[in-house]
Regions:
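N-terminal "arm"/small-domain region of PLP-dependent enzymes with the aminotransferase-like
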Residues: 2-61, 152-153
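Conserved PLP cofactor-binding pocket of PLP-dependent enzymes
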Residues: 14-16, 21, 304-306, 313, ...
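PLP-dependent aminotransferase class I/II
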Residues: 43, 66, 215-293, 302-303
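Phosphate-binding glycine-rich loop
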Residues: 68-108, 315, 319
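PLP-dependent aminotransferase-like
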Residues: 101-159
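Active-site pre-lysine segment of PLP-dependent enzymes
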Residues: 141-153, 165-186, 190-228, 241
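PLP-dependent enzyme catalytic core of the Aspartate aminotransferase-like
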Residues: 173, 327-328, 338-371
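Conserved PLP-binding catalytic core of the aspartate aminotransferase-like
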Residues: 281, 294-329
Length: 371
């Protein structure tokens, strides 16, 4: 972003004047494995159902402001009443609204980096302080003891499970203890939960803790497992009183009619996505094993276990490798070398078998050449 003029600096709120916009560093390529999208084709029959729903949707009417048909379907899927679900324009809107409602000036967010950078960014937009409790620098596991020690002095907390970009899952007993230790709200971002186990995330989700902990919020998205990143649809599950807060502060009509129609059709066809998610998980393990073979053969490669649809990989001169993947092979991956604790790390989305083979073949050449 260009530097603001002096006049604009005087007009904008002082605490916002130096904030940089989120930049995913996107470049058009033949293979894009940089954004943790689901690159698989939409399951057979689902696209037709979505297209039919869109064709039947009038565009001259405002959408249902609460997306109630979609809420009902999501509630039925998760086994909760409608009053425990709120939809949003992607998970990002709900994440921002969480910080808007429960953060603010004089309050502090408990954050566990390396993690999704938008947590700290959105906190800065609503003047919320951030207390970072860093993950283990070698394993990237949560330092549960340190987090629980810091929690009483914080006003709200966010934990990602599986964590982006490291791929680890937060233990359920730890989440319960965090809800007890934190005096405010606790959000568990489960954007990648469907990839975490063989039950589409049902065995790993922290949703079952909501009955005991009314300060717990679970964040979901249709951008990952459902391959619907372009529709921008997310939702939260929480106690009805918490949902009332989300409903009160949300932007009116933030989930448009086309998104509601497409999302409803996709969620109704959720069983069709389970085989796709299972294949992504199998490919994740195959790619991880192939990278470990490179390491066993003496190449400077380190890869961590992951329960998401991505892998975090460390290699020599990662930024240069990423550039050569883009320029010589038309493959885009995400460079995290700029992030504290992630020196020489790339995050590689798990794609289709053909996409994965392409990136593995390229890395076998580039890692050796960049040693």
């Amino acid at each position: 972003m260009a530097e603001l003029s002096q006049k604009m600096k005087e007009l904008v709120q002082p605490y916002l004047a130096s904030i940089e916009p989120y930049d995913p560093n996107f470049t058009p390529t033949s293979i894009n494995l940089s954004a943790n999208e689901n690159t698989y084709p939409v399951p057979e029959g689902v696209r037709e159902a979505v297209d039919a729903a869109l064709a039947a949707t009038p565009l001259n009417r405002y959408p249902d402001p609460m997306s109630n048909d979609l809420r009902d379907e999501l509630a039925a899927w998760h086994g909760v009443p409608r009053e425990m679900v709120c939809t949003g324009n992607g998970g990002d809107e709900l994440l921002y609204n969480f910080l808007l409602a429960f953060g603010g000036r004089g309050r502090t967010l408990l954050n566990c980096p390396p993690c999704f950078s938008e947590y700290a960014f959105f906190a800065s937009l609503v003047e919320t302080g951030v207390r970072d409790v860093w993950r283990d620098p070698k394993t990237f596991e949560l330092d549960c003891a340190a987090v629980l020690e810091a929690a009483p002095s914080c006003d709200l907390a966010i934990v990602t499970s599986p964590n982006n970009p490291t791929g680890d899952v937060a233990p359920l007993d730890f989440i319960g203890k965090l809800c007890e230790a934190c005096p405010g709200m606790v959000m568990v971002d489960e954007a990648y939960i469907e990839f975490a186990d063989a039950s589409f995330g049902a065995k790993t989700t922290a949703q079952g803790l909501i009955e005991k902990y009314s300060n717990l919020v679970i964040l979901h998205t249709l951008s990952k497992a459902f391959g619907a990143a372009g529709t921008r649809c997310g939702y939260v599950i929480a106690a009805p009183e918490v949902i009332d807060v989300f409903a009160a502060i949300r932007q009116i009509y933030s989930v448009n009619v086309l998104t509601q129609a497409a999302a409803l059709a996709a969620v109704r066809a959720r069983d069709a996505y389970a085989p796709v998610v299972a294949q992504v998980a199998a490919e994740r393990e195959r790619v991880k094993a192939a990278l470990e073979v490179l390491a066993a053969n003496g190449l400077p490669v380190e890869v961590w276990p992951s329960f998401g649809n991505f892998l975090l990989v460390r290699m020599a001169h990662a930024t240069r490798v990423r550039e050569r993947l883009r320029d010589e092979y038309s493959i885009l991956v995400r460079d995290f070398s700029y992030a504290p604790g992630l020196a020489d790390c790339l995050r590689i989305t798990v794609g289709t078998p053909a996409e994965n083979d392409a990136v593995l073949s390229a890395l076998a050449v580039l890692v050796k050449e960049e040693m």
